[in-house]
């Protein structure tokens, strides 16, 4: 069954053009929303058209692209290090536990980068491709638009070890979540609660859900915060000792739509993973009022989400002469030049 985008495909060109013009009216000291206004004015059209096309056959891709951006930014900043494949110099972040056999959408990013290299050679960084893709993915799924500051450059290395420690776990308590966010500079409760709202669409594997269904914290009992009816439903999808890679919707009501239903689910004991439910079920937590607010006020949620996304997108960006503009998001440019010198062939990478 295909995807019917909440914004029609025919309106995509006009929509992205209007977004680009709006972005041109904004500015930022290091990163600027109008960074590609003259050098690659088609960047939003190219990325947006590819996402629309992918959504027709893969309704998960919007959430997957947003997650890629999140996982990139939490590891040494938004520098596209998550997109690099293994090399002789470093191990890929794709092999890290939070990403292995889980992170997806790399081929879609490749498709975007290939198209952009044809239209605007060596101009748009992979970090900005991923940032723009996450923005448009949210927009096409019913969420807000925001002026994305641009001008990031790409890392020339990956950080496997850091990816294993910096990314929040689905089994984290609220205290652990707060520390993980604060460690990267996102220290406001609204950062944590709003960005967690990215789980309003997409899916998770049973392996990240099963422990709280059968043996929560070694009690041989389910997580007491789970709604009993929801527990029965989840056990049917994720049987004990079953296939851990089976996918379950984060949001049982509107699984492919970016909306405030996620927060209503938390209030009803229907958060899919432990780290989500912790936002509402931790006694006395300062996150509870925010969950209550966002569950009843779309404007408040969207505003907080936009603010948090911009803050996250500004984490330790490489700018100016730092890093590089990768020609291929999977490899650093020096490797491409080496292969050209040795073989005269780049397409095999």
UniProtKB/Swiss-Prot annotation:
| Enzyme Commission no | 1.11.1.7
Alphabetically ordered keywords of this record: Calcium, Disulfide bond, Glycoprotein, Heme, Hydrogen peroxide, Iron, Metal-binding, Oxidoreductase, Peroxidase, Secreted, Signal, Vacuole
Q: Which residues bind Ca(2+) 2?
A: 200, 251, 254, 259
Fetch the InterPro entries from UniProt: Haem_peroxidase, Haem_peroxidase_sf, Peroxidase_pln, Peroxidases_AS, Peroxidases_heam-ligand_BS, Secretory_peroxidase
Q: Please write the reaction equations for the catalytic activity of this protein.
A: 2 a phenolic donor + H2O2 = 2 a phenolic radical donor + 2 H2O
For this chain, the annotated S-S bridges are 40-120, 73-78, 126-329, 206-238
Offer one example of a GO biological process linked to this entry. Answer: hydrogen peroxide catabolic process
Q: Detail which positions bind heme b.
A: 199
Pfam assignment, any one? peroxidase
Q: Name the residues annotated as catalytic in the UniProt entry.
A: 71 (proton acceptor)
Localisation: Secreted; Vacuole
PROSITE patterns from the xrefs? PEROXIDASE_1 (PS00435), PEROXIDASE_2 (PS00436), PEROXIDASE_4 (PS50873)
Q: Which residues are glycosylated?
A: 86, 217, 243
Q: Which domain of life is it from?
A: Eukaryota
Residues the UniProt record annotates as site (Transition state stabilizer) = 67
Which residues of this UniProt protein bind Ca(2+) 1?
A: 72, 75, 77, 79, 81
Binding locations of substrate? 168
CDD domains recorded: secretory_peroxidase (cd00693)
Which family does the similarity line name? Belongs to the peroxidase family. Classical plant (class III) peroxidase subfamily.
Q: What name does this protein carry?
A: Peroxidase C3
Q: Which gene encodes it?
A: PRXC3
């Amino acid at each position: 069954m295909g995807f019917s985008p909440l914004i029609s495909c025919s309106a995509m060109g006009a929509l992205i053009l209007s977004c680009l013009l709006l972005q041109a009216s904004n500015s930022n000291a290091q990163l600027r929303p109008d960074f590609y206004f003259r050098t690659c004015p088609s960047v939003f059209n190219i990325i947006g058209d590819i996402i629309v096309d992918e959504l027709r056959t893969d309704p998960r891709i919007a959430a997957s692209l947003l997650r890629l951006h999140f996982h990139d930014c939490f590891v040494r900043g938004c520098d596209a290090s998550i997109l690099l494949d293994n090399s002789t110099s470093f191990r890929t972040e794709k092999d890290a536990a939070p990403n292995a056999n889980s992170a997806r959408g790399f081929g879609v990013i490749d498709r975007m980068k290939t198209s952009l290299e044809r239209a605007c050679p060596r101009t748009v960084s992979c970090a900005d491709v991923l940032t723009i893709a996450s923005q448009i993915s949210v927009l096409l799924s019913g969420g807000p638009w925001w002026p994305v500051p641009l001008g990031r450059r790409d890392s020339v290395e990956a950080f496997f070890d850091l990816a294993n420690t910096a990314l929040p776990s689905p089994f984290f308590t609220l205290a652990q979540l707060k520390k993980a966010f604060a460690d990267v500079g996102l220290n406001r409760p609204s950062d944590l609660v709003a960005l967690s709202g990215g789980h309003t669409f997409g899916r998770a594997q049973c392996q990240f859900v099963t422990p709280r269904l059968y043996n929560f914290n070694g009690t041989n009992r389910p997580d007491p915060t789970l709604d009993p009816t929801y527990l029965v439903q989840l056990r049917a999808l994720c049987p004990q000792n079953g296939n851990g890679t089976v996918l379950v919707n984060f949001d049982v009501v509107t699984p492919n739509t970016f909306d405030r239903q996620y927060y209503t689910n938390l209030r009803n004991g229907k958060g899919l993973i432990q780290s989500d439910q912790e936002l509402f079920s931790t006694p006395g937590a300062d996150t509870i009022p925010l969950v209550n607010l966002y569950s009843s006020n779309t404007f408040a949620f969207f505003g907080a989400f936009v603010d948090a996304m911009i803050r996250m997108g500004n984490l330790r960006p490489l700018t100016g002469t730092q890093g590089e503009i990768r020609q291929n998001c999977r490899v650093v440019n020096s490797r491409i030049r080496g292969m050209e010198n040795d073989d005269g062939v780049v397409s095999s990478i």
